[in-house]
């Protein structure tokens, strides 16, 4: 009797569930299958998991509780970052009592985009009512009750950076990672202490990391990361003798390795992993954790090109963790490579010379070598520099923070961001203005030589008659200059005579001096891939002071006054002497390309050469001034930079910053004896301390280029 009563109660309970489900589902005899399926799809799209549970068959409900069902959906859709669900295109595919409906399930995922699956649901008729035979496959097709969903980001490989010859400058690699295998480490504290003594680490912090990792079920703790070649073999051998220590070179720590360390650091730039703060910016909002983004230099300017597009793989894993099936896979797309115009050999030579010479008196500055006929930058160095490999690993090295505090500003690209008075290199601009306006000829002599007076043992001075100037125009006294005869333009250029060019600037007049300076681009921001500071003729955009004050006009004509210019722009202007009077637009990226497994580049785009200022003066003027400048390294201010077997068009300059500091310049163009490149050396250093540096660096580079041409 009791057994019969239990059966009756069980049947009644089942019937009650069915009746409730029917009432909630609204499934009637007429087209009940379709109506029930439709209600299921609507509940799914609304994420109404209570409604789904209420329309499930008793057998489905016996396999999972209401709370577990909600948890199941939430866990899976949370893993997939689902923000929207759409069930559409449903169609009954049989006429059996258990009706099967095929449908398209579309999940909108924040990380994966739109995921589409072909799915199906079974509607069963029970006692004339219609209920859903629910399975985990209705969450994601193919799932079983104990399966888990794993979403794995497929990292889009960042493009690499090469020099003009194809030498790799920045590549994707793996660090030398020193780590502890905790399963093989008997005494955490003792091993941490031993390794810390070898690699100069914090033993206490390391031991704490090991203890914390072990408590969390992890068996690996990274102790130190090194760029390949940085860990000494002797230290590695000693480290491996410590209990539990292992060394990995191929899988643990991916890095962005700068093959030549600090070489071309400001031009190449660096990248670091995207931060939470970055992702608040729309530009980086969709990037996955760990994706590198460029911060400065070419890494920043060409970030969108270098950065690959991440893919995604969604995998079903069984209860034992084994991979059961791939639900979805979108392949990653590698970034494209960037080929720079620089020659790494020349770049290394420039930086070696700067390190040797500039460090002697803590000078700073820049060196640029370019091709006057194309605008290609063949070398660009800023001193002091920094090691790009400080940013190679996912976490920046300790020394990276010190760069920001360093008073020498090693992160500053002085070639493009340093604004300096051009000094006497500007006399080559004034000479163009004088000749092109017809104010003087090369042989036009200064008419007031008898008014020049001796000021000191090393300087002479001149003040126009009737002038109210409180100071004279001062020049350095060079006894050897007298051998050139009268004080004309040739003598004035060779020996950098301030008196001649101050006088000539006044004769040309403010209007034409300004016009010719502007014609050469001064007062503009010269176009370049990297950001460049805008040059100026004076602090006043209208340059009114040049009209009102002859002394200021004369000072400007010799390269002082309030003139400011970047080394990049001054090098471009001087390059007109190697290009028949045209200034080419400088550029540092040769091409964007893809690279195959054999290292062969296929260009996607190539930078086209273009003039920045076409034919700013006649070729006749260029030849006249060049003939004068050829004597600068023979008899004049740059004799120390002369290289036997080379014909050089050159000009030096010095500009006083204050009573204790000056800017030293040397610009030169190789006319014969080497590749027809133009170079510029800028030295920001102590007073009377830049002359030997600028000429020795220039001579070293000229010699290198001569040897390269002959090899």
Language-model-derived ranges and their functions:
Residues 2-13, 26:
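N-terminal Sec-pathway targeting helices
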Residues 18-42, 46:
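Short, low-complexity N-terminal intrinsically disordered segments enriched in polar/charged residues
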Residues 28-38, 50-100:
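Short solvent-exposed beta->alpha transition segments
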Residues 38-41, 55-60, 107-110, 148-152, ...:
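Second-shell loop/turn segments in exported
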Residues 102-125, 129-143, 149-155, 167-201, ...:
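Small/polar-residue-rich segments within soluble enzyme cores
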Residues 161-171, 350, 367-378:
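Short, glycine-anchored, charge-dense loop/turn motifs used at functional sites
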Residues 317-327, 342, 365, 370-424, ...:
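Beta-lactam-recognizing serine transpeptidase/beta-lactamase-like catalytic domain environment
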Residues 323-365:
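Conserved, well-ordered alpha-helix/loop/beta-strand core segments that scaffold catalytic motifs
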